[in-house]
């Protein structure tokens, strides 16, 4: 894997996750899908939670844009099982499919990337 995108921050309160998603989608123009990996850990798993109502916070709904990962054929998607447990979330509650892996496995996979972008 060439590029890893690591989402660690919650979706609202700042623009970090939205900017990370924009960077991820832009990277697909320059890299093959197989060269890109996406990871969600800590508060970053909240970016994948279905049924959010950002308009109540006067925020734009960019969360649905994560569904474009299917359209862009980005299949290497991983979510930290420990982080899901922290929020009592199940894979069925996420807007996209992602492989659940433990924190140690996630860190091992991240170490294989040439570049890691953290958001």
Predicted stretch roles:
Residues 84, 96-118:
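Low-complexity intrinsically disordered segments
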Residues 17-38:
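Histidine-anchored nucleotide/phosphate-binding helix
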Residues 2, 34-37, 76:
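Residues at the starts of beta-strands that form the adenosine-phosphate
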Residues 54-81:
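A glycine-rich helix N-cap at a beta->alpha junction
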Residues 5-20, 52-53:
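Short, glycine-rich nucleotide/cofactor-binding loops
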Residues 5-7, 37-41:
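Short, conserved beta-strand edge motifs with alternating hydrophobic and charged residues
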Residues 44-56:
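N-terminal beta-loop-helix "entrance" segment that forms/cooperates
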Residues 42-45, 81-84:
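Short beta-alpha junction loops
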């Amino acid at each position: 894997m060439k590029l890893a995108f690591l989402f660690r921050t919650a979706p609202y309160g700042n623009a970090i996750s939205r900017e990370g998603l924009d960077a991820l989608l832009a990277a697909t123009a320059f890299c093959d899908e197989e060269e890109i990996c996406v990871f969600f850990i800590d508060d970053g798993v909240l970016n994948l939670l279905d049924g959010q109502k950002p308009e109540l916070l006067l925020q734009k709904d960019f969360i649905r844009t994560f569904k474009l990962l299917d359209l862009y054929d980005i299949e290497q998607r991983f979510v930290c099982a420990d982080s899901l447990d922290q929020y009592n979330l199940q894979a069925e509650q996420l807007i996209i499919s992602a492989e659940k892996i433990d924190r140690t496995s996630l860190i091992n996979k991240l170490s294989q990337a040439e570049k890691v972008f953290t958001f």
